[in-house]
Amino acid sequence: MDNVDFYLEDLRSKFNKINIEKYYLSYSGGKDSHLLYWFIKEYATEFNKLQVVGINTYMEHPEIRERIYKNSNIVLLPTMKPFEIKEKYGIPCFSKEQDFYIYYYQKATREGKKPAKTYIDKINGTYKTGFSISKKAREYVLSGKAHKITHLCCHYLKKEPARKFEKENDLKPILGVRGNESSLRKKQYQACFTKDGKFTPLWDLTEELENAIYKKYNIEIPKVYNYVERTRLLRMPISVVISMIPKKNYLY
């Protein structure tokens, strides 16, 4: 048994720990979630009754969006559309963590209030321990020329519709996330289960091993991956992303 099959059998043992009637597969059409889709449909078919749920955020590459509709039992829609989020809250610009602090700093100043000390220190780079925003972000925000920046896009496009579905159906999600994708995710995902019961069986999967699984079993990879490494919502101003999306994509 090589490393690929050893990992897949270990993955099977992880799935055996859950009651599949209490979970659903959260399917984004990306490389990680599609690996889990392939796993339950082709490799460990004893789990193929798991419900597959996707979300059409209106922001996916067309190839990924078509994949979501093709492979999902249910496709959810956002609680707010991108244009609505842009109008009410602003647009993403830097990292999620930086956008979080910038959003609350800007919100307070727009309302004529003094931002909380933590937000001031994060923006000014005077926070004594831990994370502060980058020099580039700081200069832009303090210049007075910054547009409305927010971290809330993912919340309304993905998290809120998913949570509503989970509450209505009394289900927990199976997430295709890998802990070594970023330092933030490494902190968030350190075991198969999160504190709130989400199942994250790929938390310890390396990119090298994932690629080996795809190669050995000839798992379909969308053509868009020939040009980009990841297809999740882009970390660029959402107004730029929106301008790239044909209006016909909003008819789903």
Locate each region found by the language model.
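Mid-to-C-terminal catalytic subdomains of enzymes
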Residues: 203-252
